[in-house]
């Protein structure tokens, strides 16, 4: 996401963890080449975890395994430098399935400095346990399959208009302020 933001000529700051290996340094170097501020990326053992997803021919995830990294160093960084990081930012993009304490810290600084928060997820089952966070952010971004998981419904057969009508009711009843659902080649 930080790289995509930089590619449209904005200058994001990326706050994250990477492995303390050559791979972690490669991530930092690539982001820096795209003019992403990498000052707040910390190098820690196993900082990126391990992720594997298996997709079917239609592009849907059919299996996934993961080993989440310990993000306590990120929580510590926010406790130490949160004011410095957030006071002058334009908005905040966060992965909502980070450790609860980390998300709470980010939401605290967002409220303190009146910043909008845009959230995505990589593990919908974790996000499902944190529905209260969805009510505290400004906009939740997910794909059609993730929206179906969130609302315990099947959306794959829906076109954009039907999806919009159906989601409007669900988003309102869930008290989510705003939600963007990507639909692959459908919009």
Where are these regions (language model features)?
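Histidine-anchored nucleotide/phosphate-binding helix
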Residues: 1-7, 107
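Aromatic/hydrophobic pocket-lining residues that form π-stacking "cages" and hydrophobic walls in ligand
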Residues: 27, 105-108
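Glycine- and other small-residue-rich loops at beta-strand/loop junctions that grip anionic moieties
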Residues: 16, 41, 94-96, 119-122
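Conserved phosphate/ATP/ADP-binding segment of small-molecule kinases
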Residues: 107, 111-187
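Conserved N-terminal subdomain of the carbohydrate kinase-like
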Residues: 7-90
